[in-house]
Amino acid sequence: MPPSLSHLFLLSTFASLALCSFYCKNPGYPCLNGGTCLYNGECNCTSGFRGFNCGLDSSTISAACTVECHNKGICFNGDKCYCTKDYMGPTCQQAYDFADCNKSSMKIKAYRPTEFNGEIFLMQSMFGCKLTEVTSTIPGYKQYELDVPHDSTGPCKLKKTIDATTGDVHFEVNVSTIHHAGQFGMYDGLKTVSCHYSSRDQAIVKDVTNHELLVSVTTSDGNTQNIQEIQTNDVIHLTFNPVNLPGGYKGVKILDLEMYSVQWNEVNSILLLKDQCMTQKADELGYSVSNEVDGYSGRAILKAIPLFENVQASVYFNYRLRFCRNRCKIKSCPSQSPKPMPMGEIFKHQGQGIRIV
Ligand SMILES: *[C@@H]1O[C@H](CO)[C@@H](O)[C@H](O)[C@H]1NC(C)=O
Ligand SMILES: *[C@@H]1O[C@H](CO)[C@@H](O)[C@H](O)[C@H]1NC(C)=O
Ligand SMILES: *[C@@H]1O[C@H](CO)[C@@H](O)[C@H](O)[C@H]1NC(C)=O
């Protein structure tokens, strides 16, 4: 019985700054605590205060902190975050400009101070691709949105790139802000927002909007018997078989392979293969893994040792595959050097668990 796989992409979204986003001459961007606004739009803070808008009292900066401030926010008073100019929220997790991504579209969103009275639009068209104001989900801010389908061919279309090696898909667009409707000034902003679709777990991504590639994963002993339970030192053959490989792709190889177990809501994880090579960690743990190329299917052979101490739960595999135009080449791996373990990763789907008894 092949394990069932979900077909979600891992999504991430980024916003990077291309032009200034804080300019104290713009309405809604004051210098605080007696700071003065300089000709160049930066604040000159009075002594004892710092930060882009002088909003941080230096004497309150905390070395020890009970909250985690994201995006280079600085902790003060032990549990508060002072955010950099592109982020807001209690722990600075909320960007002012960002994109919500799903499988079919990119929703570009922006928050602005209530005093903001300008316009936000995609750089390619000030008139045709304007973000419209919607009811704000954050009190004290205005909210703007524009939903652009991935396959849009109109003036608002997104820039799409596909990584030929990994199959990762990337959509990107530039968002302009003008603070005084109708005039673009040097103190207006430009940001790049993007959606990145990782092909991890997902095999090759030819087209995000039209993609249904299944990979069946089987765990077997050397005699092709499917196994559900193994003993220490048993050999496990893990086979990845794409069900509907697009034309032109003939080989499959395991790029990354991670073994994990969830017990009492804790994830124990070991990276077995990283960029096709066995990790130092794998070696330290005393088991072997090899990455075989077998034409149409990718195979890993593992030797089961007590993988996670004190863990009775089933073991699952998380993986990333590479699809090759022909038979995949065998990579010569460098001599092993220590590599960090993956941290706190959330697994999007699970292969069939094997119980190690
Ligand atoms: C900033 O303010 C201080 C006084 O608080 C002043 O001496 C200094 O010249 C100011 N800097 C600029 C660049 O205006
Ligand atoms: C997600 O997709 C639907 C169409 O299926 C679209 O209407 C919606 O706006 C999208 N949401 C986001 C956040 O992109
Ligand atoms: C966004 O703007 C930057 C800076 O002008 C430029 O390098 C980049 O190519 C632009 N990206 C898109 C998708 O237009």
UniProtKB/Swiss-Prot annotation:
PROSITE patterns: EGF_1, EGF_2, EGF_3
Subcellular location, principal: secreted
GO MF annotation list: signaling receptor binding
Tissue expression remark: Prismatic layer of shell (at protein level). Expressed primarily in the mantle with highest level in the mantle edge and lower level in the mantle pallium.
Entry annotated with the keyword Repeat: yes
Domain of life: Eukaryota
Stated name of the protein: EGF-like domain-containing protein 2
Signal peptide, first to last residue: 1-20
Disulfide bond entries: 24-37, 31-43, 45-54, 65-75, 69-81, 83-92
GO cellular component, as recorded: cell surface; extracellular region
Residue span, EGF-like domain: 21-55, 61-93
Organism: Pinctada maxima (Silver-lipped pearl oyster)
Compartments in which it is found: Secreted
Keywords annotated in UniProt: Disulfide bond, EGF-like domain, Repeat, Secreted, Signal
